[in-house]
Amino acid sequence: KGFLVKDMLGLGIDAYGIDVSEYALMHCEPEVVGRLHIGNALSLPFPDKSFQAVTSINTIHNLSRELCSTAIAEMERIAPGKGFIQVDSYNTPKEKELFEQWVLTAVYHDYPWEWEKVFKTARYTGDWYWTNGN
């Protein structure tokens, strides 16, 4: 519904967003009308190098590992070296078990070192961090 875009606009940032949900776009915050696009991270509807920054917070876990790599490469395409991606992760088998009980919709999640392989495969040069049990 554009909450993050609205917050960024409030800071004076020229922000845009995408959502897979037409409902979210139809019921978005009034301040972000025209700044949200229907789409997904696999094929971002923006030209190469069109942004000074890109962010994805706990969203790409809805994709398979292979498609996570595709989505990450798309983010790199529109803002090379200027991204921040937060992914879901865990450090121990116990944390993994708790994660799997809590996040029911995640398709791909893994240990940090496995996520690092995904970022490397995507040739991602931005920043990343993971949400975990620590």
Language-model regions, residue ranges each:
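Class I (Rossmann-like) S-adenosyl-L-methionine-dependent methyltransferase catalytic domain
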Residues: 1-45, 63-70, 74-77, 81-134
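A conserved beta-strand element that flanks and buttresses the S-adenosyl-L-methionine
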Residues: 55
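Hydrophobic adenine-recognition pocket in adenosine-nucleotide-binding enzymes
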Residues: 59
